[in-house]
Amino acid sequence: MGMSYIEHTSSHYVEMNQNTVDLYLMKNGKPILADGSGYHGNKDMYAVFRDRDPRLYHTVIPPYKVKSGKGDYPTWSYTDNPADREYIDIMGANESCSNPGVGMKRLPGQNWSASLVPEIPRLGTGAFVTCRSGYYVWKNWDNWETSFNNGNLNTADKPIFKIEEVLLNEAEAKFELGVFDQGVADKTINKLRDRAGVVKMVVADINDSFDPNRGKYYPKGNESGILVDPVLWEIRRERIIELMGEGFGIYDIRRWRMAPWFLNKPATGLWMSKELSLIHISEPTRPEPIS
């Protein structure tokens, strides 16, 4: 997953596929396919996001729908469906699309000229804030600037080396040295989980059945792959999630020798039903179908 400095236009071109979304834990610290995870299923985008690691909400725009008002920079109001505001209530309401100045990420979103984005997902081509998978990456999106309504670039800081990477480097190195334990987890990974609002890693609870979809690595000459150690897999998951969208992915995948596991899969998007239209009024062409 790469970086994008343009996140309010049709030139964005950075999105996430379902396989990557599925890597995010539940807030209770369990993988989505684990017993007792509480995963709500993937047949409804609201359900996909419900009770997940909050870092998902800050990386991919959560789903919502509002009613548009009138004017060049329209106001908006809630729909009659309570589900449509679930993630607006979590992220905070973007009360004024013309001059936000209210925080890093608020809903509903707006394009570079502050025009309201009335719903997410926006599937297809030809309009702002659209993508084909339904999972629009907004890692660098910000609503801090009170004069934001005339620009398509983001002003979020881009630190090159930060404490999160230091902690994740230490956790992975300690495992490779054979000394990763609960004490190390508490000083590294659990510092990040506390901040994110995810239940802490308990090393003793992580066994071969902890994640039924655990990844494989591929030593030279081995085409079938070998399951990654379950604890190491959780350390790597934390690195993937915390550093998502910051340019680390391709280097980590190569270093871990896991490219076949990550890349040799169909790139699917959100579950589609016939009731959900792929065509928005502002879009002149029919998009390619999502598998």
Model-derived regions: residue spans:
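Acidic/polar-rich alpha-helix caps and helix-coil junctions
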Residues: 1-282, 286, 291
